[in-house]
Regions:
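Extreme N-terminal segment that seeds HTH/winged-HTH DNA-binding domains in transcriptional regulators
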Residues: 1-53
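All-alpha effector-binding/dimerization core of bacterial HTH-type transcriptional repressors
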Residues: 4, 83-246
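N-terminal leader/targeting segments and the immediate start of mature chains
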Residues: 25, 66-67
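Beta-hairpin "wing" of winged helix-turn-helix
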Residues: 34-38, 67-76, 82
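Residue-level "edge-of-site" marker
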Residues: 42-43, 78, 190
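Residues in the helix-turn-helix
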Residues: 57
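Short, hydrophobic-biased segments on the C-terminal half of alpha helices
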Residues: 62-63
Length: 246
């Protein structure tokens, strides 16, 4: 996982391409809190001099970070650190839309949070060892006061120390990641159809056996480490799931 202590400056002894070493060092400044969300960073020339690399190498590193949504260049104003918890960036992990078309995350109702040894399934999905621990979170998402999604979440406990002491541990992964200095990368989501169990039916106000959509999502950090496994069980009578392909 990227962190502020892993890399301070590029090394001539590394076999990793130089622009990737520079990207790692710059990303570590964001993860470590040295560069705050929405803050302007030094210009390309100053950074190239600081790191002792060419302007082309620095530009390539910054281009990559812009593609990873860590930075945004604004013509005539400079380069700024993106707020990973902003609605604009959080949308990439939220594919549920209301009938009117807008994306919805919904309000969250926490049911339970506990730290426990990782199950075999959690070890497999999160790539953990058998003796690792996870945070397990159960919550319900509501839209306009009505429940539409039950979430079962597992996250590596080592990445989120003291999570149960948070005033609002039901934050979305984009918020938690920013709080804990984790830079999010890609996510993947599997969709399947199931039938509502009696307990699910009661929570979602359905008849037992009603068709439900199961959303199995895995979110990784920039280094490819899995940071959240979430299984959502939902009923979208007046909502829909949208996957954009480009």
């Amino acid at each position: 996982m990227l962190n502020a202590n892993r890399l301070v400056s590029p090394s001539k002894f590394s076999t990793r391409p130089l622009y990737l070493q520079v990207r790692d060092a710059l990303a570590a400044r964001i993860a470590g809190g040295e560069w705050k969300p929405n803050a302007a960073i030094p210009n390309e020339s100053d950074l190239a001099r600081e790191f002792g690399v060419s302007s082309g190498t620095m530009r390539k590193a910054l281009d990559l970070m812009e593609g990873e949504r860590l930075l945004t260049r604004r013509q005539g104003r400079g380069t700024f650190v993106n707020d990973q918890s902003s609605e604009e960036l959080a949308e990439r992990f939220s594919n549920i839309h209301a009938a009117e078309g807008e994306r919805i995350a919904g309000e969250s109702k926490m049911l339970n949070i506990v730290q426990a040894p990782a199950s075999p399934a959690e070890c497999a999905r999160l790539r953990l060892r058998a003796d690792d621990k996870v945070w397990r979170i159960q919550r319900v998402r509501l839209h306009k006061g009505e429940p539409f999604l039950i979430e079962e979440v597992a996250m590596p406990a080592a990445l989120f120390p003291g999570l149960d002491a948070q005033e609002m541990p039901n934050h979305r992964i984009v918020v938690l990641a920013q709080q804990y200095g984790i830079l999010l990368g890609r996510g993947e989501e599997r969709l399947s159809i199931g039938a509502a169990s009696p307990s699910v039916a009661e929570t979602l106000k359905l008849k037992a056996g009603s068709p439900i959509l199961v959303l199995d999502r895995l979110v990784h950090d920039l280094d490819g480490q899995a940071v959240e496994w979430r299984v959502g069980t939902g009923h979208f009578a007046d909502k829909y799931y949208l996957a954009e392909i480009s």
